[in-house]
Amino acid sequence: MFFKSKDNNKENELSKVAALLIYAAKIDQDFSEKEEIIIKRTILAIGAKKEDVDKIIYEGKEIENNSNQILEFTKKVKNMSENDKIKILESLWRIIYSNKEVDVYEANLMRRLAGLLYIDSKIMGDIKERVKKENS
């Protein structure tokens, strides 16, 4: 029973991360298949079991659809390891650059996230540039 509860907590945490990634993917009104693939890879990279990914994404979509503020998603991410935060931020930038453009809403989202997650602006800039080079 203990292990089941621990697994459920991890899934819930990952569902909130998925919700944040989905929020970013939808902010430009164009949630593409490419963005969903990036989200799945990220969820796997931060500890999901392969067989749980679709369920976690589904729950993330439900959370994102029923939430009205970004703060709910960032609470879980803020307490994650620095390494996992960087993976998530890289994925957020990959989602944003997946259509080769950064619109005003996406740029604003990333500025807000840097502050909410206590990410140094230099680190955020480095992540952005690294992902931008990947996509050029």
In which residue ranges do the predicted regions lie?
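Small-residue-enriched hydrophobic alpha-helices in membranes
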Residues: 1-27, 32-136
